[in-house]
Amino acid sequence: MPRVVLNGVTVDFPFQPYPCQQEYMTKVLECLQKKVNGILESPTGTGKTLCLLCTTLAWREHLRDAVSSLKIAERVQGELFASRTLSSWRSAADANGDSIDCYTDIPKIIYASRTHSQLTQVIGELRNTSYRPKVCVLGSREQLCIHPEVKKQESNHMQISLCRKKVASRSCHFYNNVEEKSLEQELATPILDIEDLVKNGSKHKVCPYYLSRNLKQQADIIFMPYNYLLDAKSRKAHNIDLKGTVVIFDEAHNVEKICEESASFDLTPRDVASGLEVINQVLEEQARVAQHGELQQEFIIDTSSSGLNMELEDIAKLKMILLHLEEAIDAVQLPGDDRGVTKPGSYIFELFAEAQITFQTKGCILESLDQIIQHLTGRTGVFTNTAGLQKLMDIIQIVFSVDPLEGSPGSQVGLGSSHFYKVHIHPETSHRRAAQRSDAWSTTASRKQGKVLSYWCFSPSHSMRELVQQGVRTLILTSGTLAPLSSFALEMQIPFPVCLENPHIIDKNQLWVGVIPRGPDGVQLSSAYDKRFSEECLSSLGKALGNIARVVPHGLLVFFPSYPVMEKSLEFWQAQGMSKKVEALKPLFVEPRNKGSFSEVIDAYYQQVASPGSNGATFLAVCRGKASEGLDFSDMNGRGVIVTGLPYPPRMDPRVILKMQFLDEMKGRSRVGGQCLSGQEWYQQQASRAVNQAIGRVIRHRHDYGAIFLCDHRFAYADARAHLPSWVRPYLKVYDNFGRVIRDVAQFFRVAQKAMPLPVPQAVTSSVSEGEAAVKEATLSSHSLSTRKAMSLDVHVPSLRRRPVGLPTAGDSESSVCVEYEQQTFSAQKRPMGLLAALEYNEQKAGASEEQALSSSTPSLRCEKRLSVEQRGGKKKVRLVNHPEEPVAGTQAGRAKMFMVAVKQALSQANFDTFTQALQHYKSSDDFEALVASLTCLFAEDPKKHTLLKGFYQFVRPHHKQQFEDICFQLTGQRCSYQPGNSLPFGEQAQSTASKQGRRELESKLTLSEGADRQLDPGEHLNQGWPHLSTHLTSKGDTSNCPKVGCVGEKPGQPAVNDYLSDVHKALGSASCNQLTAALRAYKQDDDLDKVLAVVAALTTAKPEHLSLLQRFGMFIRRHHKPRFVQTCADLMGLPTIGKGLELPCPRDESTTVPSELTHEDMKPGPSTSKKPEKTQSKISSFLRQRPDQSARSDDTIMQLPPRLPPEHTTSQWNFVCPACATEDTVLFQCPSCDFCRCRACWQRQLQASRLCPACGAVNRKQSIAQVIWPKPQ
């Protein structure tokens, strides 16, 4: 490797460094040798990470060599070097006054970046150098722990507590192996990143977390996320000693934000209430122990191994402290406009003093809180969520972070540090309320609108000064977007004698930069508040994007100011058809809000760009988002970057307002005007730095090239251009005509593609590892589906998911993929009863129910299960099972059972216990708010659990269903198909539910054509209204001629329609008639059978005499919905099913009894006295009888429909008509799990094709089919 001598230090570099890289390394050495701080900006792609590593490690080796020479000189006492005195060797070892006499005095290097993924890239760069230092990378237990029980804990603080408990009791065998195996060559010598630590730890059965802490003691360079350094609590937890170290912050443009956030907090009513609930539990538990006497108390504490060593009085005092804190916050008067009130930072000490939290008491309070958390660690249940207590501990440590000097009052210390802070108290706007507490200790705060206590730090200098006070030798801040450096240094309030603003290493033909003030249609492009959502601006921006996508090859990045702007733009473009035009050129990928889906989407984008024959892809992201922070879009992955606006912070946000006010106050106090930023300058820099970070994605190395499009007219202003990076400004050009933009960009890429070498193709990492050939096909299928899902806009943009799931627009294949991906609920989940009653049953049976996942479920359910597993990439399998002796999927208990198994698979044991206790509380108290609070914590955070939250709708009590749907939509962007009829009590929704298998949900949709009421012919109408049904009954009893419930003709004539509406008006009144007419019109337009039936059922089932109106409404139901309408009518009217009593399914009279003609008249086969029904039914029957070869086809068709009411007996000689083939047989056979009936021949054909019942999905055998036994007619 080439060697470069800089400032007397020889640096081994992987290649001959460029001039800008030599300049950068020289500045780094200047900081190290002079023990001063530095701010170094070097554009992305200039190799600053490699320069930092090589320079600092070369400097350490130089010091080490000097110390070695000194040791040798001391040992031989100058005999071998008589001409050189010992003092000259010592001066060589002393770096500008440092007293370095031994190897331990050589400074350690602490390399900090924002995330572990960025640190992994840094460690990869280190492996490419010739240096092989001792390396350590620090991480959290969440990332490094391999103990199965600890990993199950949901929260980080619970993992910490349980880990500490196991370490203290020596019950973690991974920790017990650390001392023995930490010196093994494979663990101590190589350069390991976070993944290597976990892999080697699992291989050698040694704890990676404590192994890294051991390696830290001997490491030359330590890698860690920089919140470990900036947060005093984290520094203490990881035992980080900063004295004499060299600290490097890479990607330091985020340091300001992290400094402020690590020293700030927001205390919500939920946090206080959660802490009080936990203390309540401990208090009650210890009180019960005390009542059993001293001997019993010792026995219980010994068996539980809780380690709690607190008096009952101390626990009660701790609860009083929290209650007083809650009262003090609630007592603050707020203005009536919900803006909140702001007080100086010192007010926090007054507020906490009212709750007896002071410098003098903080130690005892923190120790007590820690003991309670340790006491509850590892427990399960609703009261074991100690996150509230942990947050209170963190808050107390932040407020009282600076201990007072001896003899000085604590208030003065507080005043000295609090001028960097503001206290802001504002109403809680979140709907996630804590459940009301009902004990005598509770205050009324939880029953009012809560107040949030915010303690915000507005100066990063508070944390930076604290860092320097730890004895740091040199502090280096570096990034690609720090400009302007002077203002950045002013914010930190510590001296930075060394500054550098480096140019780029690229030539002029590798970068094109243009400001585009107007779109192709001449409309001004602007992301200003008053224009960003205007249709003209959105349309012009969409047209500009489409034109740019035509000329930019391969990957195109589009950055929006915020998520709402991106989502609104996509919504408009999709409505106008613009997104389809762009997708035809380059498929669209959208940056998701949640971190879990991001890697999936970005991998799909990379593969789309790299796929052979592809025109590339478009990636839509937001400034300050995940895609703009250190992600690699080199070469083809990012040939163009479009910035659609200046991403200013929200101007009306209280924190932004107070930050600007704070800076203005600080500037006013400083007599020298240039020593502090003003609020407006800070506001401008926040936008410009976000833009600079986004455009830094385009050039990633020396031979990369690309174009930058600044699509906002405000980029043409001089002040906006002045805040762009120095390497961009020389290439910037403002265009007044969009056509010239396209011409120049096309010319630029033609030249660049000829001049620049082709990029080395990167091998696509296979998702199939060795030894997994057996599942390769499934993995590839999953990956393909995952890619399609990543391309679906609806998946990642909540505003595009507002239409009901299951109704994608015509031709929208991407939307159909979205629906396919998101429908992870099962058909059995959509029933409105049975979950609460099945809790105890589920607890007994769930453990043994994982072996029959697909054997007893319906085909559609099995298909949905397979899809859901594939679409999740095989990360977790949710297997829904039933035992033969258990209720099948169609029953209420079966549906509840399957839902509970899915929930148990998705949640940890602790969270599942919380779920069950919340349900039991809801069952006993009907407390809907408490239920929602629990469900939100369990299912709302993880998008993969949104389907479970939505599926819970079926079990919510009717009077809470509408509220639940609104909350579900707010949290997930999905609705629960609420209809007005869902709010009826269960008894009114279905009078015979207890005796039925369970109501089927009406899923299929139909369309009522325009003017249907005018197209119906009364002459051809089968059931001419209720009077016809009640007076013209069949005289011979032939069921082929007996009208079924709701089975009316296909074309009701205008007289029949008028008669029906007239009867509705007379029976229900004008208001109800208008409501029914409106529902029918809506049914004609939206094709939603659920909606119209909900309205009709609500209107016609209130009184028994109105049930005939429900039946007669069948004249408007189309043929393919007749079976479901029949079943719904039967359920609502309480008609018995087959085998449970016989009653003709015809409308009832005023007394709701069967007409006498049905029970006394001798019924024999024969034509009906009703002419039109006779003609219609006889044609159908004769058609079926004349074509026996079609019976199987007819049967197959009927088998796909839900089970309809069983046919009535036809003759006194026990003859019946099969509903499928319409042939007569002496006996019908019935499914043992439902009311599905067929003749022997039809059952034989069905069982040969499938053993699953077409109606309920139960597994049937020939021996299990039950013969239908009828009472002999009198």
From Swiss-Prot:
Q: Which UniProt keywords apply?
A: 4Fe-4S, ATP-binding, DNA damage, DNA repair, DNA-binding, Helicase, Hydrolase, Iron, Iron-sulfur, Isomerase, Metal-binding, Nucleotide-binding, Nucleus
SMART domains referenced in this protein's UniProt entry, alphabetically: DEXDc2, HELICc2
Q: Mind telling me which GO cellular component terms the entry cites? A: chromosome, telomeric region; nuclear membrane; nuclear speck; nucleus
Q: What is its EC number?
A: 5.6.2.-
| Motif DEAH box mapped to chain | 250-253
Q: Which HAMAP family match?
A: RTEL1
Task performed by this protein = A probable ATP-dependent DNA helicase implicated in telomere-length regulation, DNA repair and the maintenance of genomic stability. Acts as an anti-recombinase to counteract toxic recombination and limit crossover during meiosis. Regulates meiotic recombination and crossover homeostasis by physically dissociating strand invasion events and thereby promotes noncrossover repair by meiotic synthesis dependent strand annealing (SDSA) as well as disassembly of D loop recombination intermediates.
Q: What is this protein called?
A: Regulator of telomere elongation helicase 1
Q: What is the originating organism of this protein?
A: Rattus norvegicus
**Which gene carries the instructions for this protein?**
Rtel1
